[in-house]
Amino acid sequence: MGRTKKVRSAGRFGPRYGLRVRRTWLEIEAVQRQKYVCKKCGKKAVKRSGTGIWECRHCGYKFAGGCYQPVTPGGKIVEKSVG
């Protein structure tokens, strides 16, 4: 239990990889595992089902997005310039 206080779920790696890498992984994992708002139905039910694949648990809408987030910062810029 003592090894997960600073790095929470990244504590499963134990002392391996160093503290900085485990903290970085913790931030990435928090973004990856949270729920996002669906573009189609508007519910906060979008979860990651695979690498770059996102699925709404409410309406079943499945789409491709970023690896860790459904919409990447670069994708937002492209949407602004196109749309």
UniProtKB/Swiss-Prot annotation:
Residues reported to bind Zn(2+): C38, C41, C56, C59
GO biological process, one term: translation
Sorted UniProt keywords: Metal-binding, Ribonucleoprotein, Ribosomal protein, RNA-binding, rRNA-binding, Zinc, Zinc-finger
Cofactor note: Binds 1 zinc ion per subunit.
Entry-linked InterPro entries: Ribosomal_eL37/eL43, Ribosomal_eL43, Ribosomal_protein_eL43, Ribosomal_zn-bd
A GO molecular-function descriptor: large ribosomal subunit rRNA binding
Cofactor(s) listed in the protein's UniProt record: Zn(2+)
GO cellular component, one term: ribosome
ZnF (C4-type) intervals: 38-59
Record note on quaternary structure: Part of the 50S ribosomal subunit.
Annotated HAMAP family: Ribosomal_eL43
Family of the protein in this entry: Belongs to the eukaryotic ribosomal protein eL43 family. Putative zinc-binding subfamily.
Function of the molecule: Binds to the 23S rRNA.
Name of the featured protein: Large ribosomal subunit protein eL43
Lineage, highest ranks first: Archaea, Methanobacteriati, Methanobacteriota, Archaeoglobi, Archaeoglobales
Gene name as annotated: rpl37ae
